Amino acid sequence: MFVDSVEIIIASGKGGPGMVSFRREKFVIKGGPDGGDGGDGGDVYFEVDNNTDTLASFRGTKHHKAKNGAPGGTRNCTGKKGEDKIIVVPPGTQVFVDDTLWLDLVEPKKRVLALKGGKGGLGNAHFKGATKQQPTYAQKGLEGVEKCVRLELKLIADIGLVGFPNAGKSTLISTISNAKPKIANYEFTTLVPNLGVVSVDEKSGFLMADIPGIIEGASQGKGLGISFLKHIERTKVLAFVLDASRLDLGIKEQYQRLRLELEKFSPALANKPFGVLLNKCDVVENIDKMTRDFCAFLNLEAQKLEAFDLEPYSGFLHPHLTSDFENDPNEKSALFVLPLSAVSALNAHALKFVLLKALQ
């Protein structure tokens, strides 16, 4: 089950109480105080685990509390510190307190202190003085801290696929990555985001995210709404997947409507570097002309992607990208326009290299 939002209560441990005790030895009638300090309460940490991509494990457990510190002992022995509580979350988890962002947990294996445990109380040995040789008082431990927090997951991926329902995004991610999403010939087959690792060669690869299809009004909550648009906010490059075979809605209209929804949801998201994939090109007549016309529509004076083995349809590359694909970060035009067929894997091999270079 994919879960990307939960509310939990976290609490650090209470400090242990100090000890009231006196030294007892043979031939010593009145030994001095030797009560030890209480142990500190356990701390609460968030730890990022790269092996998980959902918050589903929190659905059945709302309270997450560290252990209390142990009481102080005799002979000035300090009580044991309470056991820490380690809360494991996937990369991209954000922690909110009262709708204010508190922690942003991105880096894998990183452990972040959230709540400090209460300090242990002082034993009676600390309170001996010139006028009070036999103190019978010890401090209580300090209380721990409790917070109600909301965990929100924003998946971390390099490439984010954006498209209408049934555009072929799930088929594409299953073709070029290790992801195995549900695929069927009807809209909204994808109900949750999918992550896939794309291996380009033995040393290179990247992470791709496929979110449920966007419909008009998604930014206002229609369809699956904004609940999944947030998962492409962290991506470095967006890939618009357009259905080149649709007769009721051309690729220009598809692109314009998708971009409008992104702009309404987040201008920063809409301004990310992007490319365009014309899917289902194997069932479209004169796809090369359609591709060139679309480049003109984007005001893209494109150069052919001659550096790649295209099979057999030509793709186009932004002219500001050098032979090494070094791009201008202020450039807002498409980085590439590439016809492909996710079903038959036409141009799928070239797509891996194009996306990898676009990330560099």
UniProtKB/Swiss-Prot annotation:
Binding site for GTP: 163-170, 188-192, 210-213, 279-282, 341-343
Pfam families named in the record: GTP1_OBG, MMR_HSR1
Entry's EC annotation: 3.6.5.-
Name of the protein in question: GTPase Obg
Subcellular location: Cytoplasm
Known partners and oligomeric status: Monomer.
GO molecular function per UniProt: GTP binding; GTPase activity; magnesium ion binding
Binding sites annotated in the UniProt record for Mg(2+): S170, T190
Function: An essential GTPase which binds GTP, GDP and possibly (p)ppGpp with moderate affinity, with high nucleotide exchange rates and a fairly low GTP hydrolysis rate. Plays a role in control of the cell cycle, stress response, ribosome biogenesis and in those bacteria that undergo differentiation, in morphogenesis control.
Enzyme class label: hydrolase
Domain OBG-type G: 157-360
One of the protein's GO biological processes: ribosome biogenesis
CDD domains registered for this protein in UniProt: Obg
Keywords recorded for this protein, A-Z: Cytoplasm, GTP-binding, Hydrolase, Magnesium, Metal-binding, Nucleotide-binding
Obg domain span: 1-156
Cofactor(s) it depends on: Mg(2+)
Record-linked SUPFAM superfamilies: Obg GTP-binding protein N-terminal domain, P-loop containing nucleoside triphosphate hydrolases
Superkingdom to which the source organism belongs: Bacteria
Coiled-coil residue windows: none
GO CC annotation: cytoplasm
Family designation: Belongs to the TRAFAC class OBG-HflX-like GTPase superfamily. OBG GTPase family.
InterPro entries per the UniProt record, alphabetical: G_OBG, GTP-bd, GTP-bd_Obg/CgtA, GTP1-OBG_CS, GTP1_OBG_dom, GTP1_OBG_dom_sf, OBG_GTPase, P-loop_NTPase
Main location: cytoplasm
